[in-house]
């Protein structure tokens, strides 16, 4: 394999070719920074968190593929991943994970001690998550914690503390993550049943759409509370209304539980998150 092909495999292992996960991590993180700052966050903190989201998402993808390397070859969507296909060795993947982890830790060292302390919890959660799919039917609920951990870290970086209001946004993102990652799990449900991978899509069974709807409603309520606790106004309210529209559209997409529309519903959440962030930021400007 040429150096160019090897570098391409490393980039795909870190999902640099599929930024959807980075965006889904980024929007709530940016919302947390804006809410904590009451508008424009500190530029240094903003840059560190944007880079940190990219790096930690890569870490999560690498350790996930390491954990699933023997199973991914049996799943249609994942059989071409670099570890499953043999393009990247286990040793290479672990080295890349350590390098990315050290880079992320170097970033948080530029922030206050509370952020550093919270970062240790974050990396532990990131390492544990991929293995939860073997022991629990609710790995999406654990993922919700992992993908929401940047929120208290963002508040801590901006304020030096994590106020009660931060947990409304944390709860909102947790519920939202469970909802959209269950949509994602619906894509792989048949393959997961064959290889023994557990998920909320399997756990919820024929009630999957209804339970996803309940999580979407819970996320909506918590996003509203996060906005109210920060005295947000009409522009953010318009973002909330748009978020409702996205949720209804996603319910339509997953109605027949077909793979392609379920994947489309998952991907649509990027736009929902972007609208929430943009309207929140605009609400502070207007």
UniProtKB/Swiss-Prot annotation:
GO terms for molecular function: 4-hydroxybenzoate polyprenyltransferase activity. The keyword NADP does not apply. Pfam families: UbiA. InterPro entries: HB_polyprenyltransferase-like (IPR006370), Prenyltransferase (IPR039653), UbiA_prenyltransferase (IPR000537), UbiA_prenylTrfase_CS (IPR030470), UbiA_sf (IPR044878). Pathway: Cofactor biosynthesis; ubiquinone biosynthesis. Its main location: membrane. Keywords: Cell inner membrane, Cell membrane, Magnesium, Membrane, Transferase, Transmembrane, Transmembrane helix, Ubiquinone biosynthesis. It is a multi-pass membrane protein. The keyword Cell membrane applies. Its EC number is 2.5.1.39. One of its GO terms (biological process) is ubiquinone biosynthetic process. It is found in: Cell inner membrane. It catalyses: all-trans-octaprenyl diphosphate + 4-hydroxybenzoate = 4-hydroxy-3-(all-trans-octaprenyl)benzoate + diphosphate. The chain crosses the membrane at residues 20-40, 43-63, 95-115, 116-136, 142-162, 167-187, 210-230, 235-255. It is an enzyme of class 2 (transferase). Its cofactor is Mg(2+). GO terms for cellular component: plasma membrane. Belongs to the UbiA prenyltransferase family. PANTHER family: 4-HYDROXYBENZOATE POLYPRENYLTRANSFERASE, MITOCHONDRIAL, PRENYLTRANSFERASES. This is 4-hydroxybenzoate octaprenyltransferase. The lineage of its organism: Bacteria, Pseudomonadati, Pseudomonadota, Gammaproteobacteria, Alteromonadales.
